Amino acid sequence: MKKSILYIICILFTTQTTLIAQTSNSVTSASSEKEVKQVIQNMFHAMLQADTTLLRTCFSDKVIFQTIVNKPEGAMVNTMSINDFIQSIGKQLPNALDERIEFGSIQVDPLMATVWTPYTFYFKGQFSHKGINSFQLVKFKEGWKIQYLIDTRYK
């Protein structure tokens, strides 16, 4: 009888501990997902406002920007430096660059996140192109930063 009671207590304790851990992980995961989304939203807000100061805060120091271009000979990948990207944004007037995204899949690990965002891009109010953005973010001491961004572009 004592063994049965001890066994039941162990089962209840294990179940309760597991449920508490799962709840804690869900809250942490939801919080991290919200933080990751905020970095991406800040990036697009900075682009829309041509705000290079805010824009720079969204990226790691060694961020990689790439675009997949569809050529008759096949896909090619173009790479741009962070400074070139930020300078190109800074040359625009506010509201000239309007990239409208939807959050697709979001995967968050304690130190890394992957986000897929379909988008439609408007330049000075006119449709320009659409495609998919794929973000890789890293959680540094100061918070989430975009480490890698690659996109596709279609008319």
Task: Indicate residue ranges for each PLM-predicted region.
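Short, low-complexity N-terminal intrinsically disordered segments enriched in polar/charged residues
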Residues: 20-53, 57
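Surface-exposed, charged secondary-structure patches
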Residues: 79-124
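Bacterial Sec-dependent N-terminal signal peptides
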Residues: 1-27
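Hydrophobic pocket/interface hotspot
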Residues: 43, 55, 63, 115, ...
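Short, solvent-exposed secondary-structure junction/capping segments
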Residues: 41-45, 59-72
